[in-house]
Amino acid sequence: MKIVAVRSYLQHMALTKPYSIAGYTFSDVSIAFLEVELANGIIGLGTASPAEEVVGETAEMSAVHLASDFVQNLVGRDIEDFQQLIQEARAHFDHLPGTQAAIDIALHDAYGLLVGKSVSAILGRKIQALPTSVTIGLMSIPEALAEAREFKKLGFTVLKVKTGENVEEDIEKVIRLQEIVP
């Protein structure tokens, strides 16, 4: 099945509440989107929201790369060759992990929708499900405990806790969080 169109765009979205990690506080997020449309109308969707401080790329940079001639040249290619297309993108965007991710995800999504399989089934899922974790950012103990209670109400059973500001406080925070979500 041929790829007939690719579209990319950038969206800025406010977070429901600020999030602090590694000395930064975020109140909104920018996400680069890539749509890969097949001849039968199926649209695969990929996204990237890289942090420049971590990988040297921003969502804005990803959006520019996703609008490049290289990505536009996916039009006319066969989605059945998605693995080859991903390898070509990895080589072309060698030091741009966000751009690579958006292309990889969009192509996997389009192919999966075409063959009626989830991406995890295409990749060879061996187990049925894993619990999804949720991250508690850098915040005070009372705030972390309140957030953990809210996450537990939402059904989360695995917490990822950001630490590093104060060792004694971090130890107390982790111990008290384990009382809420063992």
Q: Where are the model-predicted features located?
A:
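Metal-dependent enolase-superfamily TIM-barrel catalytic cores that perform enediolate-based chemistry
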Residues: A121-P182
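Metal- or metallocofactor-binding catalytic centers and their adjacent structured scaffolds
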Residues: R7, E37-L114
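Structured loop/turn residues at beta-strand edges in well-structured enzyme cores
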Residues: M1, A101, L154
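Structured beta-strand/loop patches that form or line metal/cofactor-binding pockets in enzymes
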Residues: M1-I42, G46-V55
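N-terminal amphipathic alpha-helix/helix-capping segment at the start of soluble metabolic enzymes
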Residues: M1-L10, I21, Q87, G112-L113, ...
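Generic structural "secondary-structure junction" signal
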Residues: L15-K17, I21-D28, G56, G76, ...
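Glycine-rich anion/phosphate-binding loops
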Residues: F26, L96-D104, I141, L145
